[in-house]
């Protein structure tokens, strides 16, 4: 049996919730609750409020999503990073 087709959309993270969950507003205006994919957690990719992300939605439950990709910010090459390394 084949896997179901996932709906891929883009959105912006509005709020960081407890337990590595996020409230994301999709490009069509719908707000969903999303979680970071396993590979994003494994590689410690940080997701903050205001980040543009790609999400995958199941056709069976359109209120929950998985964040599959965080798009890079459009910053000039010489601009300082938001975080300092320790």
UniProtKB/Swiss-Prot annotation:
Q: Does the keyword Protein biosynthesis apply?
A: yes
A Gene Ontology CC term for this entry? cytosol
| Database matches in Pfam families | eIF-1a
CDD domains, per database record: S1_IF1
Keywords attached to this Swiss-Prot or TrEMBL record, sorted alphabetically, are: Cytoplasm, Initiation factor, Protein biosynthesis, RNA-binding, rRNA-binding
**Compartment(s):** Cytoplasm
Q: Name one GO molecular function term.
A: ribosome binding
Give residue ranges for domain S1-like.
Answer: 1-72
Q: What is its main location?
A: cytoplasm
Source taxon at top rank:
Bacteria
InterPro entries from the UniProt entry: NA-bd_OB-fold, RNA-binding_domain_S1_IF1, S1_domain, TIF_IF1
Cited HAMAP family: IF_1
Assembly behavior = Component of the 30S ribosomal translation pre-initiation complex which assembles on the 30S ribosome in the order IF-2 and IF-3, IF-1 and N-formylmethionyl-tRNA(fMet); mRNA recruitment can occur at any time during PIC assembly.
The entry's family comment says:
Belongs to the IF-1 family.
Tell me, in a sentence or two, what this protein's role is. One of the essential components for the initiation of protein synthesis. Stabilizes the binding of IF-2 and IF-3 on the 30S subunit to which N-formylmethionyl-tRNA(fMet) subsequently binds. Helps modulate mRNA selection, yielding the 30S pre-initiation complex (PIC). Upon addition of the 50S ribosomal subunit IF-1, IF-2 and IF-3 are released leaving the mature 70S translation initiation complex.
What is the protein name stated in its UniProt record? Translation initiation factor IF-1 2
What broad taxonomic lineage does this protein's source fall under? Answer: Bacteria, Pseudomonadati, Pseudomonadota, Betaproteobacteria, Rhodocyclales
Which gene underlies this protein?
infA2
